[in-house]
């Protein structure tokens, strides 16, 4: 398992270029360490059984640590390696940065960002990535990853596996992948997308924009005035506190505005709209009796139903559900029920 720790200067994985090391003459070379200095940076390599050519990194042995720095300070420190020096030297000689990064970070790695903006990637394996402070770009890559944005307005993405993604503080953009993702924007006004798969997608605090996308998703606004779009699939949507907008999309969805004055649409499918006493005033914009839409109220709720203008209005203590454009006479006996 590689442990990558960024220095105070910040790191962009996409700009890391190992190729020039092939030209650097070994300095203070021993069987366990060497320094390679070129173009204003110094790379220190530690391990065992090293042998060397006239230039470049070790040609034989095992590498267990790589430290890269510049005059201004540490760039990054990689520990926990068990890497063939000959393989590493081959990547460097070929200028093959893609294979080098994939090889170094091919396991269950821990990647720790700096206090400024970083661009970090996990590659394959079940990785833990922490962005720290700064506006970071964090990509978990393949595997089942845990990714934490830290403070700052971060972009977090993870294309494969089943992932645990947290925005932490800041206005973050989080995008899940093809598997089951547990995503929470936490603090800040976040944009959160589940991607493919059956996901748990939560906005957290503040006013969030939340997309379930494909799959059977749990989409939850939590605090703030949130906008929720469940996408395709038989989804469960909850607005939480605040005045929320909930859109079910295709599929038989469960839609609950929870507390606050909420606006709800179920989309295609037989949708179940939930409310309760003291929940606020909820408006259902596309209630469709023919599709099988229904309203479920908590057990024990006392309510009345009336036609007010062109709408059917369900009134409870401290709340209403307004079926916009629906005639009360068109409702079925089970269109409104307790459960």
Predicted regions and their residues:
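Acidic, glycine-rich calcium-binding repeat modules characteristic of RTX/beta-roll
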Residues: 1-27, 117-302
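Short, hydrophobic/aromatic-rich segments at coil-to-beta transitions
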Residues: 28-35, 61-65, 252-254, 268-272, ...
């Amino acid at each position: 398992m590689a442990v990558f720790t960024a220095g105070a200067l910040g790191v962009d994985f996409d700009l890391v270029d190992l190729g020039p090391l092939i030209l650097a003459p070994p300095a203070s070379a021993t069987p366990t360490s060497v320094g390679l200095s070129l173009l204003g940076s110094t790379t220190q390599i530690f391990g065992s059984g090293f042998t060397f050519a006239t230039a470049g990194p070790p040609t034989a042995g095992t590498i267990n640590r790589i430290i890269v720095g510049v005059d201004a300070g540490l760039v990054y420190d990689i520990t926990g390696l068990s890497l063939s020096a000959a393989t590493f030297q081959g990547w460097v000689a070929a200028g093959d940065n893609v294979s080098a990064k994939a090889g170094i970070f091919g396991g269950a790695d821990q990647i720790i960002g700096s206090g400024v903006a970083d661009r970090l990637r996990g590659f394959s394996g079940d990785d833990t990535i922490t962005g720290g402070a700064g506006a970071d770009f964090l990509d978990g890559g393949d595997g089942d990853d845990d990714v934490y944005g830290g403070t700052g307005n971060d972009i977090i993405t993870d294309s494969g596996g089943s992932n645990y993604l947290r925005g932490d503080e800041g206005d973050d953009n989080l995008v899940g992948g093809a598997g089951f993702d547990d995503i929470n924007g936490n603090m800040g006004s976040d944009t959160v997308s589940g991607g493919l798969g059956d996901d748990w997608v939560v906005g957290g605090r503040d006013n969030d924009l939340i997309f379930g996308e494909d799959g059977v998703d749990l989409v939850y606004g939590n605090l703030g005035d949130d906008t929720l779009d469940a996408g395709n699939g038989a989804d469960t949507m909850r607005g939480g506190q605040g005045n929320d907008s909930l859109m079910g999309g295709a599929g038989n969805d469960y839609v609950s505005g929870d507390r606050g004055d909420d606006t709800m649409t179920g989309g295609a499918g037989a949708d179940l709209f939930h409310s309760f006493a003291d929940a606020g005033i909820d408006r259902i914009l596309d209630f469709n009796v023919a599709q099988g839409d229904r309203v479920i109220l908590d057990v024990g709720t006392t309510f009345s139903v009336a036609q007010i203008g062109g709408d059917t209005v369900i009134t409870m203590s401290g709340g209403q559900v307004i079926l916009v454009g629906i005639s009360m006479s068109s409702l079925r006996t089970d269109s409104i029920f307790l459960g």
